[in-house]
């Protein structure tokens, strides 16, 4: 059974569990995904499935993608991702992949792109402490010293400084599936997941 899927984040809400507790959940619409390519260890060196998600008309795809998607006998896709598998014998090009590999209570890892925050300072970006507010202090939100003077006479690599924040690939691990609605391709995952509404998400079974 395949244990990976592509989807879009819908938003957050809360539902009541069986014991009456209120559980915050993220609603995600996963799949359906189509197998656009099967990679085998004999030919490619490893076993993997290439999945297409979010259908797109072939007329809006470039020629290399049209040729690639035509082999699967399906329309074009906006998103194509690769998932490693142990064995590819049970899969074929053009096959639809659903939520059969997931069940309520499973632990999953969810990957996505974090929200963009623009240019941010060290307090917001790295969690620095702020300076004193009174007694003539003029160092309220400044980062402070960023290096030495005589030696090494440069700013070392990796120094935490102000800059662009967000739009990074993030993975949240061991999230619990609270509910699955196969008819609507909806999965409710406990807690928040990376990204904005309608953002692309990848779900994998936690090891």
From Swiss-Prot:
One of its GO terms (biological process) is translation. SUPFAM superfamilies: Translation proteins (SSF50447). It holds the Pfam family Ribosomal_L3. Gene3D superfamilies: 3.30.160.810, Translation factors. The keyword Ribonucleoprotein applies. InterPro entries: Ribosomal_uL3, Ribosomal_uL3_bac/org-type, Ribosomal_uL3_CS, Transl_B-barrel_sf. GO terms for molecular function: rRNA binding; structural constituent of ribosome. The keyword Ribonucleoprotein applies. One of its GO terms (cellular component) is cytosolic large ribosomal subunit. Keywords: Ribonucleoprotein, Ribosomal protein, RNA-binding, rRNA-binding. Belongs to the universal ribosomal protein uL3 family. One of the primary rRNA binding proteins, it binds directly near the 3'-end of the 23S rRNA, where it nucleates assembly of the 50S subunit. PANTHER family: 50S RIBOSOMAL PROTEIN L3 (PTHR11229), LARGE RIBOSOMAL SUBUNIT PROTEIN UL3C (PTHR11229:SF16). Part of the 50S ribosomal subunit. Forms a cluster with proteins L14 and L19. This is Large ribosomal subunit protein uL3. It comes from Desulforapulum autotrophicum (strain ATCC 43914 / DSM 3382 / VKM B-1955 / HRM2).
């Amino acid at each position: 059974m395949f244990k990976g899927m592509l989807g879009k984040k819908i938003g957050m809400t809360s539902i009541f569990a069986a014991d009456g507790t209120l559980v915050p959940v993220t609603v995600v619409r996963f799949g359906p995904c189509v197998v656009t390519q099967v990679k085998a260890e004999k030919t490619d060196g490893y076993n993997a499935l290439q999945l297409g998600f979010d259908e797109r008309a072939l007329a809006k795809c470039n020629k290399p993608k049209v040729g690639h998607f035509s082999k699967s006998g399906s329309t074009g896709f906006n998103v194509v991702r690769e998932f490693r598998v142990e064995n590819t014998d049970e899969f074929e090009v053009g096959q639809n992949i659903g939520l059969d590999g997931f069940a309520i209570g499973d632990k999953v890892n969810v990957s996505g792109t974090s929200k963009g925050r623009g240019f941010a300072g060290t307090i917001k970006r790295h969690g620095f402490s702020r300076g004193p507010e009174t007694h003539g202090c003029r160092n309220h939100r400044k980062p402070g010293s960023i290096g030495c003077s005589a030696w090494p006479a440069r700013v070392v690599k990796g120094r935490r400084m102000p800059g662009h924040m967000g739009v990074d690939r993030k993975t949240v691990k061991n999230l619990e599936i609270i509910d699955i609605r196969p008819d609507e391709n909806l999965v409710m995952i406990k807690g928040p997941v990376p990204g904005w509404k309608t953002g692309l998400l990848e779900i994998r079974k936690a090891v």
